[in-house]
Amino acid sequence: MTIGKISDGTDRFCAIFRDITPWKKSESELLNAKRVAEQASSAKSDFLAKISHEIRTPLNAIIGFSEVMMDERFGPVGNERYKQYLKDIHTSGGHLVSLLNDLLDLSKIEAGKLELNIAAVDLNELTQQCVALMQPQANRERVIIRTSLATSLPPVLADARSVRQIVLNLLSNSIKFTGAGGQVIVSTAPNDDGSIVLRVRDTGVGMSEKEIAIALEPFRQLATSIRRGQDGTGLGLPLTKALAEANRASFSIKSAVNAGTLVEVAFPGSRMAAE
């Protein structure tokens, strides 16, 4: 109801009544739909977390026992072909555990249950460690990794485990989609606004704007990969973006077909640790 005085010199008022029942009904329906969607999302995330944990437990046993047999700790295995099969079992098991860990982390982030151990992180040191870990993969694919790390870079306040995963995911993606003879350049630098930025640039196949949008959706994969045989679950970039944002960092990606890709993760000045 709206009440207003009539401006004709008299002490008269006008009241206008509006029936807002349809609006209230629509509002109630929207709130209920939102509540149901949130409950469904939470239930999905909880289910993914539980199933990932249940699958990972027996997988660890498979990996562990295959490693024992590969090392022939209790005697020779015999035929060389068996040894190769054991290597395949061990490698595939390790890959599956890695995918499950990604799935578990993403489900925790969506449910708001990811635990972060915030501490001062030396971004340069962590980046160098990740480059060393990814160097064998780069060598196999004949891809060159170059680094350009800023000197006297202040530490950032972040969760070291998730930042390490961010760097490893970005390096793995760049190597995966860069042809033999190509380059991956990893750099750190301070920005004028006080933030610290981590950049991973490659000379790979690149993506169109539409493909970038697809790549950032969980479980979506691009059909134009030069490494089709190495496709994963489509969690790499979505998880990396989610981990960056969980650490209060911004995530951006620029790319063009046949012109490579640039990913930037910027930690704001408020996340700088006192030296």
Model-found features: residue ranges?
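Short conserved segment of the HATPase_c
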Residues: 32, 207-221
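Primarily the dimerization/phosphotransfer
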Residues: 29-71
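Short alpha-helical segment of the dimerization/phosphotransfer core of two-component systems
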Residues: 91-96
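Short loop/turn elements at sensory-signaling interfaces that couple input to output
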Residues: 1-13
